[in-house]
Amino acid sequence: MYASKYKRGSSNYQRRGYSRYQGFRRTAIVTRHDGKRRQHQSNKSNEDPKMLVQCIRENQFGPDFVMSHNTAISTFINYPQLGKIEPNRCRSYIKLKRLRFKGTVKIERMHTDVNMDGLSPKIEGVFSIVIVVDRKPHLSPSGCLHTFDELFGARINSHGNLAVMPSLKDRFYIRHLLKRVLSVDKDTTMIDVEGSTLLSNKRYNMWSTFNDFDHDSCNGVYANIAKNALLVYYCWMSDIMSKASTFVSYDLDYVG
């Protein structure tokens, strides 16, 4: 599944004496082996395209990324397609290096409520972005991703220390968590969100593999990923009637 493993042959050379033709024979042997080695490397380079360091960007915004108060959204990061147009991948696996994201979230009051003092209450709430690694991606019987409540127990848990449910820890784990606590008097406010998580380092490499059954299935979406998909969970919790609209750009650095 990953890079091919090569077996290195070994040879032991034992000196038994010297001959005036020995140097010539050794030179001939080295030349012959070197020629074979070069031919093997040339054929290998023609068969296996070189994997390149690339970056694929995805913008998540629009009606599908608008949440009313006390709701959550689950989605995923698209991976590169198999093909020749960059950003692409040339094999059925890639090495994930780093995921960066940056964007804005717009919080709006949906209805103007007035308290006893004749003033509108503050918009108070917690907005969260959770990056989750799915070790063995596959859709549930309903054909959907796991919901926020299924993965973390309940949306209210975003107020505290968020953790994956014990029964799902073998498959999922949190890679990055961003939380913004809001308390504003305005009916509309904008907040900046930004983060980065390192997926591979000098001691550990994270690889993702794909189910490339046919040409149409090599598109890098969640159903195409066989190992280590990246999921994104958005959650907006507030007691005030409001909504959160996100516009977030994700940059995935990879080798593929």
UniProtKB/Swiss-Prot annotation:
It is a peripheral membrane protein. Binds to single-stranded and double-stranded viral DNA. Interacts with the host nuclear shuttle interacting (NSI) protein. This interaction may allow NSP to recruit NSI monomers to the viral genome and thus regulate nuclear export of viral genome by NSP. Binds to the genomic viral ssDNA, shuttles it into and out of the cell nucleus. Begomoviruses use 2 proteins to transport their DNA from cell to cell. The nuclear shuttle protein (NSP) shuttles it between nucleus and cytoplasm and the movement protein (MP) probably transports the DNA-NSP complex to the cell periphery and facilitates movement across the cell wall. Its main location: host cell. GO terms for molecular function: single-stranded DNA binding; structural molecule activity. The keyword DNA-binding applies. This is Nuclear shuttle protein. A motif (Bipartite nuclear localization signal) lies at residues 21-42. Belongs to the begomovirus nuclear shuttle protein family. InterPro entries: Gemini_BR1, GV_A/BR1_coat. GO terms for biological process: DNA transport; transport of virus in host, cell to cell. A motif (Nuclear localization signal) lies at residues 81-96. Pfam families: Gemini_coat. Keywords: DNA-binding, Host cell membrane, Host cytoplasm, Host membrane, Host nucleus, Host-virus interaction, Membrane, Transport, Viral movement protein. Disulfide bonds: none annotated. It is found in: Host nucleus; Host cytoplasm; Host cell membrane. Residues 150-187 are annotated as: Interaction with Arabidopsis thaliana NSI protein. It comes from the Viruses. One of its GO terms (cellular component) is host cell cytoplasm.
